[in-house]
Amino acid sequence: MAEPFKNMYNEQFFDLFTKDLKLVIDDFDAHGFVSQVMDDEWEGRELKQRCIHITTILKKFLPADYKEAIAKILELLDHVKSTRPDFSVIDDTKFGLMLEYGAILDNYVEQYGLDDYETSVKAIEKITQFTSCEFVTHPFIIKYPDKMMKQMLVWSKHEHWGVRRLASEGCRPRLPWAMACLLYTSPS
């Protein structure tokens, strides 16, 4: 039987993730982070629940100010891209070698960034170049329908294929694991 996808979040992953976080957050407490993430309920959580839990714990270890936290997240992406290009490069044949990081980082924007449109849109644009952020866009489309649909149009012409893909996939009304986004209903 195949290994459950949720098990990609394991000790090996957290060892790498926390080492990377320590490089961008001077006082990052890797042991404290991992012990809070891998709590007594860890094994019972499914993939999406694990992502949300990791993100919730990560918030405690990032700067309290959302803009500063996003700056650290983007710094983390830059670090990974510059030190492990094989790990961070995606193309149209292999989408998301950074899936494990991306699912956490885009979830951070979804959970905590809805009230800071500008910072979040810039973060989404950058993160989606490493992994898909299509699940993140629905709450923003619902809260900021006109602004976000204009942004989708801008992204549809972006130089990076992942951002262009987000412009298409991110405004689909129904996506697995994403909240429904039914702004426009068919008259039929």
Segments (PLM) and residue ranges:
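Surface-facing alpha-helical segments and adjacent helix-coil boundary elements at the starts of domains
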Residues: 1-186
